């Protein structure tokens, strides 16, 4: 598939509100194999050194989330199988919420603050 060369904007970060930005940043840095790249007055950012994209965790006083996400990440293991990666993510503090249906199964997990994400097959 061919994609156009011209783009209107470039996505540089995904911002996630958190009651504990440091906790979520550490979880996601470990889950993705990234590192903390900035700790500012507004929160904590993770990414890859000089990478084009970051995830920013911003502290908000709203308390724990109470509804399903309208946006979630799908992640795919690179260096291990799906079950081994599931075990690793659970050990980091994720919890299993559901299992995907059909022939392309995936696991629905939640991070330490309850934000859902999917673990796909490699």
Task: For each feature predicted by the language model, list its residue ranges.
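Short, charged amphipathic alpha-helical segments flanked by flexible coils
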Residues: 45
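Glyoxalase I/VOC metalloenzyme domain signal
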Residues: 1-38, 48-98, 110-122
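Short acidic/glycine-enriched loop/turn segments that link adjacent beta-strands
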Residues: 40-42, 101-105
């Amino acid at each position: 598939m061919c994609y156009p060369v011209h783009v209107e904007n470039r996505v540089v970060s995904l911002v996630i509100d958190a009651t504990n930005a440091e906790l979520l940043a550490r979880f996601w840095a470990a889950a993705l194999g990234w590192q903390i790249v900035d700790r500012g007055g507004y929160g904590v950012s993770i990414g890859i050194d000089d990478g084009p994209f970051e995830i920013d965790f911003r502290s908000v006083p709203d308390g724990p989330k109470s509804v399903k996400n309208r946006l979630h990440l799908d992640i795919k293991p690179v260096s291990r199988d799906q079950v081994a990666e599931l075990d690793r993510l659970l050990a980091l503090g994720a919890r299993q919420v559901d299992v995907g249906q059909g022939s392309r199964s995936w696991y629905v997990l939640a991070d330490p603050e309850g934000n859902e994400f999917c673990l796909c097959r490699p």
